[in-house]
């Protein structure tokens, strides 16, 4: 099976997971309250465990230091995406909570739930290493700048609070880095158990999204033009620009493709969870996730095909 077929197979699995969520809601096996329980499980346990165990098992101290170029690449990516989100927000005349959420949606992609399975299926030997190193920066950015952008514009809520940085995800990153640097290895029973828990993150996150999609006004959301600004800029034009740019840097073709694909991911599902938790407009964020996730079924294979065409 070639890499393009592997990519489309992974996306097909995502679609099936989301359809399962839709069916569960439509048949009333689950309701919106049940979905919130799933979201809490994913964001407070499954996702942190997945990040921790994948980093501990996929990154070694030597390779961590040799992969520092990914930190630089991630920094360049975020700077460019923040600038694009600012310009795009002005173009669509967005204000207040929507302006902040639009920036968050334009910057943070669904790397954890979609990027990891896609990249590791394409590059089974080194893909996890690349994603794990990137995830350190990605999650730190999400839980610093992301928390600020997904907080309500009310001055009290929008004020920076150091305590918001202390959460299951940042703790899992810190513990993982300590394990990598010290060479600590987990007992097999604990390692295998955590792997099983972490493996539930992607299916449950996609089922959650499908269920929420079944609860919202799809027609209303797909008519908002500003969401398609994210699709065009973040998911199509920027990944192509980024792929060409990385071609001029001394990085391997695998890192080049991995980072460009990472930048093309749809809106991170954690954005809507954080928007609801921090008093912003979760429905607006969910609309962005709906549109970009549906479009990603077509944009990700297209982008990957263009990468191969460019060479």
Question: What are the roles of these predicted feature ranges?
Answer:
Residues 1-311:
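Alpha-helical transmembrane segments of multi-pass small-molecule/ion transporters
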């Amino acid at each position: 099976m070639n890499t393009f077929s592997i990519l489309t197979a992974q996306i097909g699995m995502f679609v099936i997971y989301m359809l399962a969520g839709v069916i569960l809601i439509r048949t009333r096996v689950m309701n919106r309250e049940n979905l919130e329980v799933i979201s809490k499980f994913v964001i407070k346990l499954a996702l942190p465990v997945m990040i921790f165990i994948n980093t501990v098992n996929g990154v070694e101290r030597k390779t961590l230091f040799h992969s520092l170029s990914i930190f630089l690449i991630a920094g360049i990516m975020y700077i460019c995406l923040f600038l694009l989100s600012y310009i795009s927000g002005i173009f669509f005349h967005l204000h207040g909570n929507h302006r902040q959420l639009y920036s968050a949606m334009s910057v943070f992609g669904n790397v954890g739930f979609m990027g990891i399975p896609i990249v590791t299926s394409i590059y089974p030997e080194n893909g996890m290493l690349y994603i794990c190193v990137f995830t350190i920066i990605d999650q730190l950015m999400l839980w610093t700048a992301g928390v600020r952008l997904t907080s309500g514009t009310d001055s009290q809520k929008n004020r920076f609070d150091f305590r918001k940085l202390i959460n299951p995800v940042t703790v899992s990153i810190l513990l993982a880095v300590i394990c990598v640097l010290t060479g600590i290895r987990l007992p097999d029973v604990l390692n295998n158990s955590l792997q099983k828990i972490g493996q539930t993150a992607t299916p449950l996150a996609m089922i959650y999204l499908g269920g929420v999609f079944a609860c919202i006004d799809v027609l209303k959301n797909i008519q908002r033009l500003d969401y398609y600004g994210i699709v065009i800029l973040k998911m199509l034009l920027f990944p192509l620009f980024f792929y060409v740019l990385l071609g001029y840097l001394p990085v391997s073709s695998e890192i080049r493709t991995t980072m460009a694909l990472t930048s093309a991911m749809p809106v991170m599902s954690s954005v809507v969870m954080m928007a609801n938790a921090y008093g912003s407009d979760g429905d607006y964020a969910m609309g962005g996730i709906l549109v970009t996730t549906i479009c990603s079924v077509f944009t990700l294979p297209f982008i990957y095909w263009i990468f191969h065409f460019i060479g």
